[in-house]
Amino acid sequence: MPVLHNRISNDALKAKMLAESEPRTTISFYKYFHIADPKATRDALYQLFTALNVFGRVYLAHEGINAQISVPASNVETFRAQLYAFDSALDGLRLNIALDDDGKSFWVLRMKVRDRIVADGIDDPHFDASNVGEYLQAAEVNAMLDDPDALFIDMRNHYEYEVGHFENALEIPADTFREQLPKAVEMMQAHKDKKIVMYCTGGIRCEKASAWMKHNGFNKVWHIEGGIIEYARKAREQGLPVRFIGKNFVFDERMGERISDEIIAHCHQCGAPCDSHTNCKNDGCHLLFIQCPVCAEKYKGCCSEICCEESALPPEEQRRRRAGRENGNKIFNKSRGRLNTTLGIPDPTE
């Protein structure tokens, strides 16, 4: 029986990936469709992906599939053909190709079965996730941005919005998608006569969010097909102005794709213009935050003097201090002045 999970250490896999000479292509895709047996589907896809040397993160549930992956350039077309042939629901599926890609986004394949491909917190039995808003293409997005009756709603988390967003887009302040959905309905109650345009990184969150808004009585709802990634690609291909400003946060080692030259965020330590996310180098912290090169040198990649001092301690002493401590996978929320301690290199399903 084939091994259907990874048995090699992360460090060894990362070193192997970095030593590769063949270029890779970072791809994301999703599809809402019924999967009768997610576990069997997961095992079959794992074998298919492994045979093509695909790395990345894939989630499956009864409601569909959500994937962010890295594929050897020479295998991209074979991967596309085999994915399309795997299930009729996947035939012709749009694959979002990364905009700013060094091919080093992933080094291991992780494929998991979950209750939902996006953690939405919805338990309303009458909710119809297929009753989505209308798609918008790049030219239509730009037209909507100039429409005074249109409101753009960013359905990403606060740390994503902080480094980049559409002009005048509204932020729904939250740490997770499940928190955003009820807040979006609440914040838009006074604007039911407006055109609501929802967007996210690759389309998966705003598609479900558009259905949720319609379920809650909003009739004029649109969402951007393929999200920010597909919008920027099509706008560039068609010679249209790209109206997204800043960087598009992505959920892999790159942590961002440059969309425009503007830097709209600031270093969380000194306030200098900066939009580069990093994780605190202290193994007892790993806070996700924005740090400029000057502060990176000053604090040796750490988020504070305390973490800088702790990371310089002998490994055994660091382990002793970490024992029993709630640590790791924190995200700095500057707007709220607090940390969310439940997220990692953030999980795209949250």
Swiss-Prot record:
Gene Ontology terms for molecular function: oxidoreductase activity, acting on paired donors, with incorporation or reduction of molecular oxygen
Listed Gene3D superfamilies: 3.30.70.100, Rhodanese-like domain
EC number: 1.14.-.-
Keywords: Oxidoreductase, tRNA processing
InterPro entries (UniProt xref): Rhodanese-like_dom (IPR001763), Rhodanese-like_dom_sf (IPR036873), Rhodanese_C (IPR022111), TrhO (IPR020936), TRHO_N (IPR040503)
Name of a matching Pfam family: Rhodanese
Cited function: Catalyzes oxygen-dependent 5-hydroxyuridine (ho5U) modification at position 34 in tRNAs, the first step in 5-carboxymethoxyuridine (cmo5U) biosynthesis. May be part of an alternate pathway, which is able to bypass cmo5U biogenesis in a subset of tRNAs under aerobic conditions.
UniProt protein name: tRNA uridine(34) hydroxylase
